[in-house]
Each structure stands twice: as structure tokens, then as C-alpha cells.
Regions:
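Long, contiguous binding/interaction regions
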Residues: 548-753
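Catalytic-core regions of core metabolic enzymes
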Residues: 1-544, 551
């Protein structure tokens, strides 16, 4: 689960099916490999020829003299089983299968599926690609049939060759360049986009990740990877398949929770590429300068929720209120007005609209604006027939779309720093045992869930909230307003309740909404509850429930809170504390706990001097992804925290990092060791192979605890003031025990038998 794929930049590449035949896949790919300055070694494998492209070729993998780290397989699917077995035998860690899958016969697809099925447990990482395949421009690697991409900072994961071609064209126009292109054939590839998202997130050369949504892979794992990546760099999710109104609402909800930018059309994708590539330049207000009347542009801006501001203090004619400075301004005059606007304190961003002219004035203005764009720190959007570069467009509407994308992304980043308020005191938690007693008695089931009265809804309700199971994303709660459809996803938090109340105008019903979402966290874990509808009419709020005892379980896109119930633990001094998972609604208590710690202890825990957690740190600590993170807390009967421990993914594949704090009153009482045991167990369940942390050399108590728990302590390779603690989480193998007493006991038992 926590493995990253082999890097797509090999040192020694084996090309199986390399060819000189015209119009063949092997010929096209070998040409692409040889025309770029690839610094690695290329070895062709061809059954019939001793040389290919002037290079020595081998008849099969068994005859290769040198070890290789990637095999590029260009032969038909009928060869896959034999080739993959040979890769396993030769210890080649990564096999990339490239085909024009759209042109293959059904039997060839079946052969590919069967070969992949047989090799699913092998140690060979298999990636199935469409003809655009893999490109790493900075390394000169192009394993596909498409033109070489310019080097840059955008990592691309596409699911079809046509998407790769479109994204390549958009990249060429926008100009940010590509760090890595991965063209996966989504229906077949065992190595999925989530694997490569993890890789690109850790890649320092990649500053933006643009990924085409893969509906074929596990959605929980996919959006967990996107969420981790979006904490480090911008992520664009391009939705190439048809998404109906409900799925769009779900993807918007995922965007709010994970922090990625969704795009549902090619135009939205192009605008988002510009916006996210210039993500450090954001603004709320947009001024405009134009050499043509632009009043109609405000109509388009209104649809996007943008207000265009005219040039400040420019003495423009009152009849041209939208930045029109005349139809034939000299280029220097246009530039002077634009620079004056950018230097004005009220200007946050400027849109320069340059209409075609009979002479070369428009081209000259565009060049001047391009140079000015490089010199200013404020966003300068350029619309011109001569546009070519980042934040440059051929139509003003495209620039408006990019400006909107910047604002949306800024809002998404701010949402990632929000924390949930504590649960309201009036909430009641349903009992799963009571729910399971009444699957057929719907009125009683509504009572067990603390829902409004079970009753047939009115014909024209004031609002309708619908809970149901999406085939791809699991449990979803929808709210339909006259403007759009909203969705929120479990585990539901008070942040979701507030979002629903605010966006759907349900302030009068906020108590009902809070209880509903709290109850639905329980209902989401009960498969036979397939649907719940809550509506409000003149007679009050009612609920309707649909059940199906035979319903199949659909995994929710977000992992639920740990199923392990809260338990009590007795300290050495006899005090009893409650141990439970940390929830998003614990943010306020978490902050109070950090504030209560002595200054020195806060420093040893966070390795910085702070009085409290920043909003970003607090949100990061409390808004956990329980598919790859975990946290537990210890609290007294009155809710006072005595300790907290957490873990999350590290940069090293298969490794997680931990952190722990205990209040002074609980130190030396066995609590820290117990909390560590809880998160170690959860990390094992999530599939991690190692748990680690860097501990200050001046913190002997933490080093002693780590040693007691089995962590190996070594000096940190990064900082002499730190020690690195690492615990192997892998289950011990069944090896003979080197223990005289144990062995003697086993011999006696054997003799008695």
C-alpha cells in the first residue's frame, strides 16, 4: 500500500521489440529514444536481428550481459507472459508495456489481462501504457511515439493518448514545461495513478501535478494520494469522463477535503494549468486595460463571479468604463498606462486586452506586455492574438477563467487550514446494535438513528437532503438548491455541517443538520441502509429510509475513524484515563493541550519555539486521513488531555513518522508507552513497514522510551543534534529461535510425543 513505483528514469533500459521496420511501434519508439539525449544505456532485444539502429541486439533477456532496471515491452500481448517471467528471472524491477490499445482485437486484450493476472504477485512492477508512454524531458527519455516535451516543472499523468496530446499542446502554449509524463492505460495497468502521484509529490523537480482522473482504480487510495500530494504542491485533477451532476458534486466535495483543483472541461484544464503554474501570484481584484470596448466582457465575468475594475485615476472617458483607452494607442502609451496601473496600491492584478490592429501595433504591444509581465510581482494576464506563454491567452474569456481558478485555488488552500468546532452538546450517538435489531421496522430504525419522524414527505418541501451510496465513492449526502447540487462525504464533521447550513441556507434547521450528519456517520457503516431522505415542509421535518438486506458493501472514498472502541488505561499512580482516537472536532482541545505544555516540552516535541500551533499545523494535526495516518489521545473524566500520539507518512516508502506528548502530570506513569503501542498497532494495520522519528540528543527521556519499545537509535545523518529512531513493523519470520532453554523444551516435548 505504501510502496512507490520504480522511478521512470532508468539507468539501463531494455527495449524488447526494438525494430527498424517502418511504421512499427518498435521503430517509432526506438527513434524517439535515440533522437533525445538520453544519458542511460539502451539495449535492444530482437529475436531476428543481431543489430537494431546500429546497436547490438540480443535474442532474449537471458542473454543480457548487464543488469537492467527497466524493460520497455513493445511486443504484442501474446508475448507478455513469457517476457514478464523472464523479467522476474533476470531481476528487472520494472516492466513497461506499451501498445496502441484502442486498435487491438478483443483476444489480444484477453491475453494481456491473463498475463497480468498470472504475474500479479511477482516482484516485478508492471506499468501498462498507451502510446504516449513515459517521458522525462530533463533526462532525455521518451519511450513513446509522441513528440518530445519541453523540460519544466509539471508532472503529468494521463489515461489516454488523446489526453496526452491535448495536455502537451496546452503545455506548449502555457510554457511551464514538463518534469515527467506518465501515459497509463487505466483499464489494465497494475501500477496506478496513485503510485505515480506519490512519486511526483516527492520529486523536487515537479512543482505542479496534473492528473487525469482514473475511475478504474481504488478511489480511496487515489484521493488519499492526491490529499498527501496537495499538502506539498498544487494538484490539478482533470475529469475526462462524463460526470453527471451528482458526481460533479462529489468531486467538488473531494476537492474541498483534499485541496486539489478539479477541471471538468478542456478549457477549465487549460485555465487551471496557467493558474496553478503561477500559484504564487494570486489576487482578489482584477483591473482591465484594453484597446477595444470591453463592456460585454463584464457579462462573462459576472458568470464567473468576477468584477472587472477600470484603470485607477487614468482620466478615461466616462462612456468607456471598462478600461478602454482608445482603439489605436501607441505601444509605449499602452505600456505606460499598464505599468502605472500595476504600481497603484489598489491594483492586485491586471488584464491587458490587446485587439488586432491593421498594422503591427498589436504585436508590439504584446511584446511590451510580455516583458512587463516578467518585471512585475503582480499577476498580469494578457489576451492577444500573439499570446504565447504563462498567463497569456488568445481570448479574454480564457484569462477570466484562469483568474477565477487562481481565486478558487486560494480558497481551497485556506480551507485546508480550517478546523472543526467541537461537537454540540445536544448530539446523540446511535447504537449500531440497536440499528441492527430493526432493519425492517423503518419507524423504529429512524428513532434508533435519532432522525426526524419517519413519515411520507410533503409534495413541495422547503429542502431535501438525500443520503445514498454512490457506486464509485460510497456513502454521500446530497443537498439540492436552486443553483446547484452540494455533496458532503463521511466521516462527517462539524465543518461539513456548517458548510451545508451556509451553502443551502439551512440556518433555521442547524440543530437538525448537526444531528443528521452525526447520525449518518453511524449509518454509513451499516450496509443495509441504502438511502435516507430528510425533508422539511409546513408540517415539520420528516425522514424516509430505504433498506436492502442483500445490498453489497461499497467502500467509502474516505477511510472511517478507527473501529477500535475507546478503552480505559490505569496509570502507575492509580488514575484512570480514557484512550480514544483523535477526531477533527478535537482541534480546540488539541490547541489547549499544546498551550498547557511547558515551553521546553513544546520545543522538544515540535523542534521550534512556539506558544501554540499555527492554523495550518493545527489543521494538519486534526484533519487526518485514517487510511495512512492515525492519532490517539488520553483524557481524564472531565475531558482534560494528559497525552497525545500520532503518526503519518514519511518521504521514504513504507515508513511513517511519529510524534508524542505527555502532560507533566502523566510523565513516568506508563502513559507514553501505552499511547505508542496504540499507534504502532494502527500503523501495522495500515501496512507500514517502519516507524521512525528524529529525537533531540538533549531529550534522553524520549530516547529511553524509544529504546524500550524496540526502536533502533542512531545518529541522524542530517543533523548532529538529532538521533534517528527506527522501528521495524514487519511481522517476524518463522526462523529458528536461538535459545537453549526453548530448544531443550522443544526436544523434551518431541521425545514425549
Amino acid at each position: 500500500m505504501h510502496n512507490r513505483p520504480v522511478s521512470p528514469a532508468p539507468r539501463h533500459l531494455i527495449v524488447i521489440g526494438a525494430s527498424e521496420r517502418p511504421h512499427s511501434l518498435g521503430g517509432h519508439v526506438l527513434t524517439a529514444l535515440l533522437r533525445t539525449p538520453f544519458g542511460g544505456q539502451i539495449t535492444p532485444v530482437n529475436l531476428r536481428h543481431k543489430t537494431v539502429g546500429g546497436m547490438k541486439a540480443y535474442a532474449n533477456l537471458n542473454r543480457l550481459p548487464d543488469a537492467a532496471d527497466m524493460a520497455l515491452v513493445l511486443t504484442p500481448p501474446a508475448s507478455y507472459e513469457a517476457v514478464l517471467k523472464a523479467c522476474r528471472k533476470q531481476n528487472i524491477p520494472h516492466a513497461v508495456l506499451v501498445q496502441d490499445w484502442d486498435g487491438l482485437a478483443p483476444e489480444a486484450l484477453e491475453q494481456a489481462q491473463e498475463a497480468l493476472r498470472k504475474m500479479r504477485k511477482s516482484n516485478v512492477r508492471i506499468t501498462v501504457c498507451h502510446p504516449a508512454a513515459l517521458q522525462v524531458p530533463a533526462s532525455g527519455l521518451n519511450t513513446g511515439i509522441y513528440p518530445d516535451l519541453p523540460a519544466g516543472g509539471v508532472g503529468i499523468i494521463s489515461g489516454h493518448a488523446s489526453e496526452s496530446a491535448r495536455l502537451a499542446a496546452q503545455m506548449s502554449q502555457a510554457g511551464p514545461g514538463v518534469s515527467c509524463h506518465i501515459g497509463l492505460h487505466y483499464p489494465l495497468s497494475p501500477t496506478v495513478s496513485a503510485d505515480f502521484i506519490d512519486m511526483l509529490a516527492a520529486d523536487p523537480a515537479t512543482r505542479l501535478i496534473a492528473v487525469s482522473h482514473n475511475p478504474h482504480e481504488n478511489q480511496r487510495r487515489l484521493f488519499s494520494a492526491i490529499r498527501r500530494a496537495a499538502r506539498r504542491k498544487p494538484v490539478l485533477l482533470s475529469v475526462g469522463h462524463y460526470a453527471d451532476e451528482e458526481e460533479r458534486a462529489v468531486l467538488q466535495a473531494l476537492s474541498r477535503r483534499c485541496g486539489f483543483m478539479p477541471a471538468f472541461t478542456p478549457d477549465e484544464t487549460a485555465a487551471a494549468l496557467h493558474a496553478l503554474s503561477a500559484a504564487d501570484k494570486s489576487a482578489r481584484k482584477l483591473h482591465i486595460i484594453a484597446n477595444e470596448p470591453c463592456g460585454s466582457l463584464q457579462t462573462q465575468a459576472d458568470e464567473l463571479g468576477i468584477t472587472l475594475h477600470p484603470l485607477p485615476d487614468d482620466g478615461r472617458p466616462s462612456e468607456n468604463p471598462y478600461g478602454h483607452i482608445g482603439g489605436h494607442p501607441p505601444p509605449t502609451r499602452y505600456r505606460a498606462l499598464a505599468e502605472s496601473c500595476l504600481q497603484h496600491s489598489q491594483t492586485e492584478a491586471l488584464l491587458a486586452v490587446i485587439a488586432p490592429t491593421a498594422d503591427n501595433t498589436a504585436e508590439n504591444i504584446t511584446r511590451l506586455m510580455t516583458n512587463l509581465q516578467r518585471q512585475t510581482d503582480k499577476p498580469l494576464f494578457i489576451s492577444s492574438p500573439f499570446s504565447d506563454g504563462l498567463l497569456q491567452f488568445t481570448r479574454p474569456a480564457q484569462a477570466l477563467q484562469a483568474f477565477r481558478c487562481q481565486n478558487v485555488y486560494t480558497g481551497l488552500k485556506q480551507q485546508q487550514n480550517q478546523t472543526a468546532k467541537p461537537l454540540p452538546g445536544h448530539l446523540k450517538t446511535p447504537s449500531v446494535r440497536e440499528i441492527q435489531k430493526t432493519p425492517a421496522d423503518l419507524p423504529q430504525l429512524a428513532k434508533a438513528l435519532y432522525l426526524p419522524e419517519y413519515k411520507t414527505p410533503e409534495a413541495n418541501p422547503q429542502f431535501v437532503l438525500t443520503f445514498k451510496r454512490h457506486a464509485r465513492y460510497g456513502a454521500v449526502l446530497y443537498a439540492r438548491t436552486p443553483a446547484h447540487t452540494l455533496a458532503v462525504l463521511p466521516p462527517f464533521t462539524t465543518l461539513d455541517s456548517e458548510h451545508l447550513i451556509r451553502q443551502a441556507g439551512l440556518k433555521r434547521h442547524q440543530k437538525t443538520i448537526h444531528q443528521l450528519l452525526h447520525s449518518l456517520n453511524t449509518a454509513a457503516a451499516v450496509p443495509f441502509i441504502t438511502g435516507i431522505t430528510v425533508s422539511a415542509g409546513s408540517a415539520g421535518t420528516t425522514s424516509d429510509i430505504q433498506t436492502d438486506p442483500q445490498a453489497e458493501t461499497v467502500e467509502n472514498v474516505f477511510a472511517p475513524y478507527p473501529a477500535k472502541p475507546a478503552h480505559t488505561f490505569t496509570l502507575k499512580n492509580g488514575q484512570t484515563v480514557r484512550i480514544r482516537p483523535l477526531l477533527p472536532e478535537d482541534a480546540e482541545a488539541k490547541q489547549n493541550f499544546v498551550r498547557s505544555l511547558p515551553e521546553e516540552q513544546r520545543y522538544t516535541r515540535y523542534m521550534m519555539h512556539l506558544a501554540e500551533l499555527s492554523p495550518a499545523m493545527l489543521a494538519r494535526a486534526c484533519n487526518l486521513d485514517y487510511s495512512c495516518e492515525g492519532a490517539v489521545i488520553a483524557e481524564t473524566e472531565n475531558g482534560t488531555w494528559l497525552g497525545a500520539a500520532r503518526f503519518g507518512p514519511a518521504d521514504t516508502a513504507g515508513r511513517c513518522e511519529f510524534g508524542i506528548s505527555a502532560a507533566p502530570a502523566a510523565q513516568g506513569q506508563g502513559l507514553a508507552a501505552h499511547l505508542m503501542e496504540q499507534i504502532i498497532q494502527t500503523a501495522k494495520q495500515q501496512g507500514y513497514r517502519e516507524m521512525a522519528a528524529e529525537i533531540l540528543q538533549s531529550n534522553p527521556a524520549m530516547q529511553k522510551l524509544a529504546g524500550k519499545l524496540g526502536f533502533a537509535l542512531t545518529p541522524s545523518p542530517h543533523d548532529s543534534a538529532l538521533a534517528e529512531a527506527v522501528l521495524n513493523l514487519a511481522e517476524p519470520k518463522n526462523t529458528p529461535v536461538n535459545n537453549i532453554r526453548h530448544n531443550l523444551k522443544q526436544q523434551i516435548l518431541a521425545l514425549k510425543s
